[in-house]
Amino acid sequence: MVKVEAIIRPLKLDEVKAALHECGVRGLTVTEVRGFGKQRGYTERYRGTEYTVSLLHKVKVEVVIPEEMMDEVIEAIMAAARTGEIGDGKIFVTPVIEAIRI
């Protein structure tokens, strides 16, 4: 088994969920996260004062799947989450030794 973690734009969450469902993924975890990479944030004006927003809002989608599904799931996430702009996100894959139901 492997855990696939994808950090994506919040607006792409519904598309990614639908793509994962098409792949046969039946469970996932979604977490709101903040961070930056090459995008580095942006500057915003509010009531005449300039503010720097350095940590951007993203969504982390986590799925634990059989290793045989890994390539299909990664391709589905990439296709659904990609806009072609800087800040589309990252995908991380880690091995899972065991998953225990509580």
Question: At which residue positions do the language-model features occur?
Answer:
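Positively charged, small/polar-rich N-terminal and surface patches that mediate targeting and assembly
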Residues: 1-102
